[in-house]
Amino acid sequence: SIETDETEWLKHLQTPLFAWAAVGEIPPNISLDPSLKINLKDVPLIKCPPWLGIDRALAAWGAFQKSIQSCTMNPNGLLIADAGTVLSLTRIKANGEFLGGQLVPGLGLQLQSMTKGTKNLQYPSNQNYPSESFPISTEAAMLKGSIQSLLGTIIEAKQISQVPVWLCGGDSPIILKNLQNRNIE
């Protein structure tokens, strides 16, 4: 079963945590051993700026390590697209050097922004991606436009960087499906 309460989810872990990282506040009802916390200094990205989020650093380092281990590292590096609350694009060289990135509101933030920033738009109750190019319903149009903006950001960054894209994050399944529908790998 899928747990939405982090406390309940943590109770079901079969093995103890050997390390953890977090962006933002830890809920007060979750108890984590501070000695197991991964900090930015623990992630060996070259030229990693001190302000980089631990989520971006770990995603970049994970993609870098997987590329090295699988012998699929592109000579020009990688582009990591972490499609979560924020779509973060992180570019790294083939030697693991941080090259920068881009940040765009994720799907949920885009939909929330339209809902909160306008008088008559409601947060879509149906999260199914519309198949039509220009949907009639407002909810479908909001979803289509938001997802298209994420796809466009990723596609353009891939074209500019000319490197493989590693996709992760909560919105990655819908983004992957739409990239595959366009024959983009």
Annotated model-derived regions:
Residues S1, L78-A81, L87-I92:
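Short beta-strand scaffold segments in enzyme catalytic cores
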Residues S1-L78, E97-E185:
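Nucleotide/phosphate-binding catalytic cleft detector across ATP-hydrolyzing
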